[in-house]
Amino acid sequence: MEEDTGIDEAKTYTVEKSEKVEPEKDGLSQFRDEEKSLGADMEDLHDETVRETLGKDQVQGVRENSSVEPNVEDVLEVNETDSVKETVVSAIVPVDEVEENRQVETSPSLAASSDSLTVTPCLSLDPATASTAQDLPLVSVPTKQEQRSDSPVVNRLSVTPVPRTPARDGYNWRKYGQKQVKSPKGSRSYYRCTYTECCAKKIECSNDSGNVVEIVNKGLHTHEPPRKTSFSPREIRVTTAIRPVSEDDTVVEELSIVPSGSDPSASTKEYICESQTLVDRKRHCENEAVEEPEPKRRLKKDNSQSSDSVSKPGKKNKFVVHAAGDVGICGDGYRWRKYGQKMVKGNPHPRNYYRCTSAGCPVRKHIETAVENTKAVIITYKGVHNHDMPVPKKRHGPPSSMLVAAAAPTSMRTRTDDQVNIPTSSQCSVGRESEKQSKEALDVGGEKVMESARTLLSIGFEIKQC
């Protein structure tokens, strides 16, 4: 009996427990059902907002792309939810126009234009103010034809650069300079003729884009144009149209401007006579040179050679003096300033360079130790002093008489190249050869050279001519 009562109690306990669990399961399932229904409501609300937005976009696309305004009825609908109250403007559009709008949107050319349009956002209004939304004015979107008529038409032009090099005139030119010009803005290129001893030059003026605007010829060619196997017709016209620079023998230089864009054939007839006259004048001068007598031409040639030898400023007199090593820098009576030093091949001792301190005096000298005798020095003078010997300073002492006599030819304006050897021995034989050389020095250098030679002879030195 006790066992039966225990089983009954257990059954009642399980029944009570199951009754308690069933309400809990029912509450959980009900909560899940509510969540599902709420999610479905949210999805429906989202789908409705997406459809309304697509409808507005289609309305605006149809208004933009259609040439005739469609019959569109704007309906104001108020959708109220538990949390948000929204007012959405939707439009009723025919199906064929929507399909046409979809085809237009797929074209890439109109996709960029549709991106620039602004979409009017939805207005959140209260139910009391919802009636005022019907009074909002509709914004008219311009049609495609109006946009085409209002937009400016841009023509893209391709600029073809003109070649910088102008037509050849038959001569060979070498460029030697270029500079920028402000007025007119551009650049100038400078050329000279490559022919030897030809002074002809030309200037090419170019604009900003590099096109040659004009050519300025300076000087006259002293030769014929170099021969070529073939010429283009344009080169022949330009060569014929160049105006001769000098009209007569007295004119040295003249400018002639030839615009690069102009046709030179118009001025060819005017210049043919002048160029022919120039050729005749050249031939006449050549004939006169051929008919000139031989002695007269020889005399002119000698005079030109002598004038060339006198007019050469780069050549300087050169005197080489061998003296003892104890001779000072200012031992010749002049004042010197050292301006350089360098090593010479074959001599372990450096060579020192000096210039005369007198203003405007071109005389230079360099002193180096002799290779065979380290106690002797070799002094080389270049140039002639154009001033008197300065008064010696006390600190330098009196100048050496032997060195002064040896450097005496540098104090006169002569152009003879002599070499004076001053041996270290005090006794030398003076014979007929020294007397003959002294007479030659008298003829070339004058009385002062003779006096210096007599001084050297009196102290026992020998002068040798190179």
Curated annotation (Swiss-Prot):
One GO cellular component, as annotated: nucleus
Name assigned to this protein: Probable WRKY transcription factor 32
Classification lineage: Eukaryota, Viridiplantae, Streptophyta, Embryophyta, Tracheophyta
UniProt-recorded Gene Ontology molecular function terms: DNA-binding transcription factor activity; metal ion binding; sequence-specific DNA binding
UniProt keyword DNA-binding present: yes
Positions with biased composition (Basic and acidic residues): 8-38
Any Pfam family: WRKY
Metal-binding keyword on record: yes
